[in-house]
Amino acid sequence: MTRTISVIGSFKQHNREIQRTCEIFRNIGLHVNSPESAEIVEEGIDFVRFHTDPQACSDAAIQSLALHRILRSDLVYAVLPYGYIGRTTCYEVGRILQSKRPIYFSERPGDFPVHIPDAFIVDVARLSALLEQDDWCPEWLFSGVNNEEGILETRLINGDFVDD
């Protein structure tokens, strides 16, 4: 079965890098669920739309459709040149973590108040090599993490809220 991946990041700021990353993943045989297209409808607007997005849908509906594609992927890769993450990508990362889906990052996100273990910061070449190994299995960011941040994040997701 073909592995699936979604690539997220600031399409407004870094679409070229994101599309190059998508092409690398396609070249090793992965199916890229999201983004579905490389063609941006209008440059410079706050919420980027692609030509494959239904024109009649609101921005919120487009985002929800994208999240459906993202969350049904085997893993997600966040392309963050210079650590830039952006508002929409922050939102997506939060939903991905809450859904216990595997996510990896090209660079450590700046201005992002979640602990990212070093093992989840991997460049595209290293992640591609891992994905070509049949026995490699992507993990959720907090799987097996027993430090304070990992325990607190796991408790949040499980609805076991701390009374500080």
Region locations from a protein language model:
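Conserved catalytic or regulatory cores that recognize and/or transform ribose-phosphate-containing ligands
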Residues: 1-164
